[in-house]
Every structure is written in C-alpha cells, then in structure tokens.
Amino acid sequence: MATGRGGRWSVVGTALITGPTAGIGQEIARELSARGHHLILVSRDAVRLQELADELGDAEVLPADLSDQQARLPVEKAARDVDWLVNNAGYGITESFLESTVEQEQALLDVLVTSVMRLTHAALPAMIERGHGRILNVSSVAGWVPFGTYSAAKAWVTVFSEGLAAATPKDVHVTALCPGFTRTEFHERAAMDISGPGWMWLDAERVARQGVKDCDKGTVLSVPSNRYQALSLVARHAPRSLLRQVAKGRER
C-alpha cells in the first residue's frame, strides 16, 4: 500500500496512462506514481515521455500514435494486465466540421473514441477476474453540449463509462472525469482563446487529484469544482433546442 498526494491509501500495481506528457494526464501520472504505482506511459512524443519517466522513476515508456491501428496494438497488449487504465489522450481540431478534412475527423475519433473502447476492452477482463481494477476515462463537460465532433466524442466517453460502471463488479470502478476549462497545452494547440474570466479556469493538478480520488472510491461521474457541477446540471437538463441555439451563437 502507498499514499498519494491526497493522503488516500491505494493498492499498488501497474497503471497505464495515455497522453501523460502535459496537463491533466501528466498530473494523473504524478499522482499515481506518488501512490506507488508502476507506470506505463503512452504518447506520440517519445522525448517528453522519457523525460517524464526519468522524473517519476518507476515508469516505462510506450511511444504510440493512438490514431494508428497498428501502432495501437502494443498498447492494447500492455493494457491486458494493468490495475489502473487512464484514457486521457486527446486533442481538438482548429477547423469546424465543414472546414476540416474527413481524415482529420477520423483521426480525432480514433484517438477520442476507438482507442478508449479498445484499451478498455483489453483491460477489463483481467480486472474482473481478479476482482479489482480502476478505469479513469477523461471526458469533458463539453460532452453535455452540441459543439461538433469533439463534444460528440466526449459525450460518447461519458455514456460509455456510465454503462460500464453499471455492468462491472463492485470493486472494478469506471469513472468519467468531466472537467471544465483547465489550463493545459490543449487550448494552445487547438488555437483556442484562453482569455476568459479567471473563475472558468481549473488547475490541472487539482482536477487530476479529484479524478483519481473519485475513481478510487467508485464515483461514476467526476466533475471537479462546484461551479462546473452547477453548469453541468443546467446543461444536462436544459432543452436541447436551447443548447443548439447556444452552439449556433458560438459558431458566429
């Protein structure tokens, strides 16, 4: 047993984390490392993967492009015997659906949806057999609103996680972590405006810590911060026609 930064005890084992080189994924890696887990770190960026592995110590790197079916196979194999699976890898497309190419859209879905499904399918059987396991799928509050392919993919991740949580044994936990705006490289890479009011922005370390804590105790939907919990409640119960109008206003 080992304690994490939040002080909670956790069973030591192996954790596979996709997209750990920055932001929420990196902070989740640090939290699970602090709890005593051996880490398998997965990303396209081999250099930054190795830098993080060197920082954390008990970690191995598995460079892979999760949008590539063949490159994903070794990751699926590695996921078959882990205690924690963290599906965090993700990115956004700068162009709208009408401006992007179908190849861009397909690659996005391969990372945000297909890899989540396939890695989860690989990891779950051993977790169920041993009677213990944790799957933390990083989704987003964007999944509550109709903002194109990214939002649709995150809606899938959330509903997928809820369905699995209802079907798995008691000590195999599946959690969808649904943060709001979080200060990471994600928004810079997607060329998004990050000049919004300060109250909108969350700290990646706090988001990661809350997600790990909630997954460990069996919370199915983890929405860090009271303000985003309130906004999520409104979005989930608002008329769909109203949300479509909000989406239209955003595109103008």
Annotate each PLM feature:
Residues 21-22:
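Conserved glycine-rich cofactor-binding loop
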Residues 35-51:
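Conserved glycine-rich Rossmann-like NAD(P)H-binding loop of the short-chain dehydrogenase/reductase
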Residues 88-93:
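Conserved NAD(P)H cofactor-binding loop of Rossmann-fold oxidoreductase domains
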Residues 96-98, 104-109:
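Substrate-binding pocket helix/loop in short-chain dehydrogenase/reductase
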Residues 120, 153:
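Active-site helix of classical SDR
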Residues 140:
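Residue(s) in the substrate-gating loop at a strand-loop-helix junction
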Residues 159, 165-230, 241:
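SDR active-site lid
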